[in-house]
A protein has these predicted regions:
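A glycine- and Lys/Arg-enriched "phosphate-lid" helix/loop adjacent to the NTP-binding pocket
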Residues: 91, 98-162
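NTP-dependent small-molecule kinase module
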Residues: 24, 135-199
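ATP-binding Walker
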Residues: 13-14
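Walker A/P-loop
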Residues: 17
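Hydrophobic anchor at the beta1->P-loop junction of P-loop NTPases
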Residues: 8
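ATP-dependent small-molecule kinase phosphotransfer cores
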Residues: 30-119
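Pre-Walker A (Motif I) flank of P-loop NTPase domains
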Residues: 2-5
Length: 199
């Protein structure tokens, strides 16, 4: 029997990485993240996030992320799921729709078509959105310059947040958690929803 694929989404500073890692540890699942979870992905991550002085169009940024995701799906995620292992992801395709689509203005129809090419039939069984205002998320993050995406202004991150909320309203198998609560409160809400899955 194939494993479950659960993905955590949210703006930077929402706490999604902490919760994804926690759930993977508690459930004995494979923790995966994007971008940069493979040797190829490490190189792509450098260009996507860390090469902040390199001019890059939103479409180029999206295509690099999709290249990383395609390789990640075929080399890590699908083999793990096929072997019966649960996979807990820190970001998946919704991140590209939210950040490069709603945030950067890349055409959503074109992004969806490219996403289909990148991931094929691989879909999460559940996507958990940890919703948090950009102002609070910014206060929670370490006070550094951030990468190419983290360093964008609050208006950009608000567009991303609204994009996520729109995806949660219109797509199947999403669960929205109020990220403004304490870490134990957020964890309890997540665990209550996860208990409904056929682990």
């Amino acid at each position: 029997m194939a494993g479950l694929f659960v993905v955590f989404e949210g703006i930077d500073g929402s706490g999604k990485s902490t919760q994804a890692s926690r759930v993977a540890h508690q459930r004995g699942g494979l923790f995966v993240f994007e971008p940069g979870d493979t040797p190829m992905g490490v190189d792509l991550r450098h260009w996507i996030l860390e090469a902040v002085t390199t001019p890059m169009t939103p479409a180029t940024e999206a295509l690099l992320l999709l290249a990383d995701r395609s390789h990640h799906v075929h080399s890590v995620i699908e083999p793990a799921l096929s072997s019966g292992r649960h996979v807990i992801g820190d970001r998946f395709y919704a991140s590209t729709l939210a950040y490069q689509g709603y945030g950067r203005g890349v055409d959503l129809g074109e992004l969806r078509a490219a996403t289909l090419l990148a991931i094929g039939d691989c879909r999460p069984d559940l996507t958990i959105l940890i919703d948090l205002s950009p102002e609070v998320a910014n206060d929670r993050r370490a006070r550094d310059q951030g990468d190419r995406i983290e360093s964008a202004n609050l208006e950009f991150h608000d567009r991303v947040r609204q994009g996520y909320l729109e995806l949660a309203r219109t797509e199947a198998d999403w669960f929205v958690v109020d990220g403004a609560g304490s870490m134990p409160e957020v964890a309890a809400d997540i665990d209550e929803r996860l208990a409904q899955l056929p682990w």
